[in-house]
Amino acid sequence: MVAVAAFSSSGQDKPAHTPKLGLFVYILAAASVIGGFLFGYDTSVVSAAMLYMPDAPGLKPMDTVWQEVLVSISPGMAAVGSLMSGTSSDYIGRRKVILGASAIFTIGALVCAASVNKIMLLVGRVLLGIAIGFASMIVPVYLGETAPTHVRGMLVAAFALMISFGQVVANITGGAFSYIDPYNVGWRLMFAFAAVPSIIQFVCFMFLPETPRWLYENGFETETREVLEKVYNGDKEWVEYEMAEIIAFNEDQAKENEKAHASGPVIWRILKTPHVLKACFIGSMLQAFQQLAGINTILYYTADIIRSSGISNNHTTIWISVLLSLCNFIGPFVPMSLIEKVGRRIIFLFSCGLVVLSLVFIGVAFLLVNHDSAATLPANQYGSNFNSSYPDAKGCMAYSNCDYCVTTDACGFCHDANTKQGYCLPAGFDNPEVYSSTGSCTNSNGSIANNFKWEKYYCDTKYTLLPIIACGVYLLTFSSGFTSLPWVLNSEFYPMWARSTCVAISTTSNWVFNLIIALTYLSLTQVIGKYGAFWLYAGLTVIAFIFILFLVPETKGYSIEEVEMLFMNKKQRREAESRRRETVTEVRSRMNSTVSFGQHNEVHKY
């Protein structure tokens, strides 16, 4: 555990009263977290759309490779977008990057909806990925730099809540639009819907201000005070305190830079500043651990998990997905309501521990399914209509039961409808979901042989619903802290000069590991089984728990300028506190002189 003495970055006690929130803060927060909604919606809606796009006119044929590319290209481009947004937000401001992201969200959604071929659809998914990367990096930074200290954690947690809400809405709209000519119109409406909230966000940010910390950093002192007046609802005591904090931090940082002859790229300065490098490493690892806990395996492969329970109807699959996404939506209310009361660390550790248990539960559920699934018959009983020279035939024969068989794309289980015994056969070339390419479930005679049934995705067992229940428990426990805390902490960890770059690096870490987990899950299940894959994620989450326990500090109650000191050693912290007290004394002296001078002039005017 990280223990840190309480201190004030400005060397002065904070105002004793809690500032009252005005309408401005609520509008600012609501407009900002639309970025989280779009993040969740656009990463999830493709799951429902993919049930229809492979057979849509203009998009056929769409093989497995194309489907994987269309799904994974957005997370891949999000990593690029998050890196781009770090530098650009330093130069043009946080607000303009959010405006740019909103515009790209709108264009990407409309391009996807209007696609007449796979290339056009791919371009749209690339644009959406870049916009997701922008939003996932810049919205937490914007909220962290603008929100009052006592609600900062709650508002950044609201960003994570809106990611989950976007996923719920994606499944609901997917279900609703699936009834409107889904192969021609429905899937297009699923993508087009996202243009509505992105346009709303764009319009809102035309009138919302830049963050006060970016404004002061770039020489707009008057505008900084004006924004703080709105944020703190005209509370002069809090406005003066925050203004002194910002000025003191910037002047103190300027002295340090001059003393150290700081120059060159920000990334080089980060590498040469041990406590900032430490914070960036911890922040990046938290984002990596979020993905290593397997969250997007569940979110991206929800339909596969549901189908493994025996659900074959696409509409039913989508509506069950809605129920699971609701579990993911309920959880974030826990950190939103408790984060400013009990702190970040306790919620994070609690959620992390429950995630370990739920991952073990999922693994046990899949293990029970595996052990209860029908065994394959020995090779000498495959019959004369089985041709072992067919592609994948010998490989399929090697699987010992139905569960191992249907886990592999190339195979399916052909079983006697009465005895449940059967064969693992290669899937058919034209209709792999309906027939095998050889053996008793082939369509060589126009239909499958009497009493035989072909299963491509699931096995008949008494445990088939258990994985769905386990996934619901997992989503509930994961979203109760693991979803939001990496975003909250990364919005707080870094000094102003390094914030956008460090958040960009940590966000890129999230997207890179997102892509790695998404691309390796199916391969993992074929090597160590579905249960083995989730137990591996459980082991990685145990490491995350230990990492959080010993390396992540509590940031509750500290101003965003104070949090930087939590990563310093004791000597550095004492020096920083002393230096900042001296700076704030000078700042307050100047501020008081300015006020007195203004009052003196006013007396003589009248």
Swiss-Prot record:
Pfam families recorded: Sugar_tr
Matching PROSITE patterns: MFS, SUGAR_TRANSPORT_1, SUGAR_TRANSPORT_2
GO molecular function, one term: myo-inositol:proton symporter activity
Membrane topology, record value: Multi-pass membrane protein
Reactions catalysed: myo-inositol(out) + H(+)(out) = myo-inositol(in) + H(+)(in)
Gene Ontology cellular component terms for the protein in this record: apical plasma membrane
Gene3D superfamilies named in the record: MFS general substrate transporter like domains
InterPro entries: MFS_dom (IPR020846), MFS_sugar_transport-like (IPR005828), MFS_trans_sf (IPR036259), Myo-inositol_Transporter (IPR050814), Sugar/inositol_transpt (IPR003663), Sugar_transporter_CS (IPR005829)
Residue spans, topological domain Extracellular: 42-63, 118, 174-188, 300-317, 367-464, 523-531
Record: glycosylation sites: 314, 387, 445
Biological processes per GO annotation: myo-inositol transport; transmembrane transport
Main location: membrane
Annotated transmembrane regions: 21-41, 64-84, 97-117, 119-139, 153-173, 189-209, 279-299, 318-338, 346-366, 465-485, 502-522, 532-552
UniProt keyword annotation of Disulfide bond present: no
Localization of this protein: Cell membrane
Induction conditions: Induced by hyperosmotic stress.
Cytoplasmic side: 1-20, 85-96, 140-152, 210-278, 339-345, 486-501, 553-606
Keywords, in A-Z order: Cell membrane, Glycoprotein, Membrane, Transmembrane, Transmembrane helix, Transport
Tissues and organs where the protein is expressed, per its UniProt entry: Expressed in the intestine.
Leader sequence residues: none
Keyword hit for Cell inner membrane: no
Role: H(+)-myo-inositol cotransporter. Probably by promoting the transport of myo-inositol regulates intracellular osmosis in response to hyperosmotic stress.
Cross-referenced PANTHER family: PROTON MYO-INOSITOL COTRANSPORTER, PROTON MYO-INOSITOL COTRANSPORTER HMIT-1.1
Family: Belongs to the major facilitator superfamily. Sugar transporter (TC 2.A.1.1) family.
Name used for this protein in its record: Proton myo-inositol cotransporter hmit-1.1
Organism annotation: Caenorhabditis elegans
Record gene name: hmit-1.1
